[in-house]
C-alpha cells in the first residue's frame, strides 16, 4: 500500500507502508481552517479527538 504523507493540501509525497499497515489516513483539526494535514499509514484507523476530521481508506494514494 502507498499513502500520501505531506501536510500540504495538495500533496505529492508518498510513502510505502510497512507490513501490517493496511490503512491510509488523513487528519485535520476542524477549528483551525489553515491547519496542516497529518497523513500517513496505519494498521487501524486512528481515533480522533473532538473537532478532528479523520478519513481512512485502503487503496493506493487514496488519502488526498
UniProtKB/Swiss-Prot annotation:
Pfam families recorded: Toxin_cobra-type
Q: Which GO terms describe its molecular function?
A: toxin activity
One Gene Ontology term, aspect cellular component: extracellular region
Localization, per the record, is: Secreted
Q: Where is the signal peptide?
A: none
Which keywords belong to this entry? Disulfide bond, Secreted, Toxin
| Stored Gene3D superfamilies | CD59 (2.10.60.10)
| SUPFAM superfamilies documented for this protein | Snake toxin-like
What family does the Swiss-Prot or TrEMBL record give for this protein?
Belongs to the three-finger toxin family. Ancestral subfamily. Orphan group II sub-subfamily.
Protein name in UniProt: Weak toxin CM-9a
Amino acid at each position: 500500500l502507498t499513502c500520501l504523507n505531506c501536510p500540504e493540501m495538495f500533496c505529492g509525497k508518498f510513502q510505502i507502508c510497512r507490513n501490517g499497515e493496511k490503512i491510509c489516513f488523513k487528519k485535520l483539526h476542524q477549528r483551525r481552517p489553515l491547519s496542516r494535514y497529518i497523513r500517513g499509514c496505519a494498521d487501524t484507523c486512528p481515533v480522533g479527538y473532538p473537532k478532528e476530521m479523520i478519513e481512512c481508506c485502503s487503496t493506493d494514494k487514496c488519502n488526498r
